[in-house]
């Protein structure tokens, strides 16, 4: 049984999602402005190497992700057709960022001190925002009808894509096997928690999402487009 949403419900969802995206952008700006690259008022309990990575992440958040969130949220409230393409680019990133920063940037070692735990609800909001917008944005894309891809071109794309994904996976798996054999790489010694958070997220979520996107191009091309955007939105950011 197909249920038709009322105009009031549709309007409510548009405004709610738009405000969630805008608030997510504001939170990212707050975290970035107070992070180690700018004001340095947030102290993460992690290694110097990880702090250097956070500085780069702060710049990305300020000049790429936050503008995407603002533009996507505002354009969705204003009922612009481009909004769905902007909304679907950021959900995976928001969840990934919230989890890696919330969990991975604190290591219970006396060598590191900080106060990042005070930002728990900031990171939680970003994770929930990513989950909600991912589920919502997928519904914005309707099946495109009969889509045909040139089999030769699709095969070339699939091979290149899968090889790239497998090479990326092998890099993480190699380090996982090193840890399993008690031959710890430098990245593990600096922050074991962050090491596992990133590998679990990549090997358990983003890499399978990429492989699934290729599979859908072959089996369900009419509905594969939003999954492509989910993956490439994360890959781009």
Pin down the residues of each PLM region.
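An N-terminus-focused feature that recognizes amino-terminal "leader" regions
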Residues: 10-17, 21-63, 69, 75
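Central hydrophobic cores of alpha-helical transmembrane segments
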Residues: 86-94, 226-236
């Amino acid at each position: 049984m197909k249920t038709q949403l009322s105009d009031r419900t549709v309007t409510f969802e548009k405004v709610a999602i738009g405000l969630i995206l805008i608030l997510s952008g504001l939170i990212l700006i707050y975290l970035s402005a107070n992070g180690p690259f700018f004001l340095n008022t947030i102290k993460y309990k992690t290694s110097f190497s990880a702090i250097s990575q956070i500085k780069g992440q702060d710049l990305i958040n300020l000049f790429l992700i936050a503008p995407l969130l603002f533009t996507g949220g505002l354009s969705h409230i204003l009922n612009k057709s481009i909004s769905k393409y902007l909304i679907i680019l950021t959900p995976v990133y928001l969840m990934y960022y919230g989890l890696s920063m919330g969990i991975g940037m604190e290591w219970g070692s006396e060598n590191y001190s900080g106060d990042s735990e005070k930002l728990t609800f900031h990171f939680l909001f970003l994770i929930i925002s990513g989950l909600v917008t991912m589920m919502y944005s997928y519904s914005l894309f309707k099946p495109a009808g009969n889509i045909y891809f040139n089999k030769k071109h699709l095969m070339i794309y699939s091979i290149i894509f899968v090889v790239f994904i497998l090479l990326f996976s092998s890099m993480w798996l190699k380090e996982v096997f090193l840890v399993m054999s008690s031959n710890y790489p430098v990245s593990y010694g600096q922050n074991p928690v962050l090491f596992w958070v990133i590998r679990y997220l990549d090997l358990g979520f983003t890499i399978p999402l990429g492989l699934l996107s290729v599979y859908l191009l072959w089996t369900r091309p009419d509905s594969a487009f939003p999954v492509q955007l989910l993956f490439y939105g994360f890959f781009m950011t």
